Amino acid sequence: MGDRRRFLKELAMVSAAAVVAPDIVAKSSNVNEKTVREAVRAADDFMIVERKNALPITGTFLDEISHDIPHQNWGVQQWDADFRNMKAIGIDTVIMIRSGYRKFITYDSPYLIGKGCYRPTYDLLEMFLTLADKYDMKFYFGLYDSGRYWDTGDLTWEIEDNKHVIEEVWQGYGSRHKSFAGWYISGEISRATRGAIRAFHDMGKQCKDVSGGLPTFISPWIDGKKAVMASGSALTKEEAVSVAQHEKEWDEIFDGIHDVVDACAFQDGHIDYDELDAFFEVNKRLADRYGMQCWTNAETFDRDMPIKFLPIKFEKLRLKLEAAKRAGYDKAITFEFSHFMSPQSAYIQAGNLYNRYKEYFEI
């Protein structure tokens, strides 16, 4: 603390002298560049919370086929740099959030193109797997989303198309790439949903059967007060699920899927920060009961802002990751690095979040 005060005092003297007598400053041997560097570096001491007291992010979604996030139009050079930036902060797992949404797809799929999907310009699946191989990361493949679940509320609509996609992808890609490490069942739910248990079970079982038992996971949201439509103007809603009801419904869901779904990464952005511990404790207890891993999907975008969506304030991210550590979660992944945390994101705040994260975790 004494060193910090001394450095800051010297920096103040330098600044004042520069205004009053710049020639003197330039010639002075006592006030030099090293003093200024040390004084500025001492500003790091302004962090007042305990560092590294949170669960670090070790995985990220790759949101190349998005519902509601603007496309960055990156090519392989930008993606290569982004994988390098991920690796630099300890990310070892990348998850393609979905292999397609309605008619837009990520790879040259004979089945989906035959059903009317557009042929993609680039084989993004091959590119992501190649980069994951290069940077020694684990790659999880996200299943296809036809959009019919969102239209009907019945998740079983997604089973048939994914029977073909799972087989096609494993034969064409998974068996060739060392990084292909598992499957993401991409249907998102929050409550007891029509067809959810059957759909998760059928798709999870097929993923495991074709790949020799590679792990699967899901990433539902919690139906909290921030669970509002992204297309609407409201930031919160009156009706939100209670902790007890959340536990009851997810106990039933886990009971029906735990033999073919290995992990659950609940999205953390739909509840308030003072609710994190209560919901996280329930999530971990349920996962332990059914022998599943409990991950957190730590959202790096801010649901509290009227502009949808911008990078989150670091303090909010810290609160969520600290709660995950207190609950004993197994892993933290994020939605998602490339838009909201990357130094090369279209949002300048994302690079600042990256730097604050590195400071906190002393990377």
Regions found by a protein language model. Name each.
Residues 1-15:
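N-terminal secretory signal peptides and thylakoid transit peptides that target proteins
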Residues 16-22:
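Hydrophobic h-region of N-terminal signal peptides that target proteins for export
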Residues 40-363:
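Glycan-processing catalytic domains of CAZymes
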Residues 1, 22-51:
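C-terminal segment of N-terminal export signals and the immediately downstream linker at the start
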Residues 11, 29-32, 294-295:
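Residue-level detector of intrinsically disordered/flexible regions characterized by low predicted structural confidence
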